[in-house]
Amino acid sequence: LEELYFQFGRYLLIASSRPGNMPANLQGIWHNNVDGPWRVDYHNNINIQMNYWPACSTNLEECMLPLIDFIRTLVKPGEKTAQSYFGARGWTASISANIFGFTTPLESQDMSWNFNPMAGPWLATHVWEYYDYTRDKKFLKEIGYDLIKSSAQFTVDHLWHKPDGTYTAAPSTSPEHGPVDEGVTFAHAVVREILLDAIQASKVLGVDRKERRQWENILAKLVPYRIGRYGQLLEWSTDIDDPKDEHRHVNHLSVSYTHLRAHET
């Protein structure tokens, strides 16, 4: 049964993410109406990423290409979002995206679940993941590195250099859960990964040594993960976790079950 379930997951991705087509969205290709829940869009706060966790790791690298092509369409509008909302270089996205290049927060909605500036960098980590599995240096040089580098630049500009010398992602949110906060664990996990990706990519290509040193310096001074009074990994910057909370989003644990790294190994 477990093997059947595993292969069924691969089948779903194979069927809904073919090269030259759109990536898998919330309902894939199986929705039977013109419209559907959440407009059948792309949710960048774990849903689209979750769709692609089995791509490279189960030998379906070609299924990752529609996602990368889609990410490339977000760069230009994402540059405007980065500049207009954050005064930052590079590009980013927010909680939702669509085929028309939507990258801003949903301004009519509650920012506690809708504000997610790390959505763009999280998407960009899949670009490095594709290279990491394929070792396609031509892809990295011609397509991948620019996506990763510009996402890292946004991340650097979004960080707050605190008086104590550390860096934190502020403001930030734990997707769809809790308050707007200073340096939630999920945001720091994405920051660590995109900076590690940019550092490694620049080393592979032998470029941007000066900027690489900046990324390394920030990475070394990023606020560390914290353990709370229950022995849990804190979700927010302070110990406000409730052990009775059964919310479906646990993005702060992404370093334990996705390709995001808890630290450099």
Locations of regions flagged by a protein language model:
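Alpha-helical scaffold segments in carbohydrate-active enzymes
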Residues: L4-A15, F70-T73, P77, D146-H158, ...
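The feature captures the catalytic groove of carbohydrate-active enzymes
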Residues: N25-N44, R89-E142, S150-N217
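Conserved small/polar residues in nucleotide/adenosyl-binding loops
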Residues: T258-T265
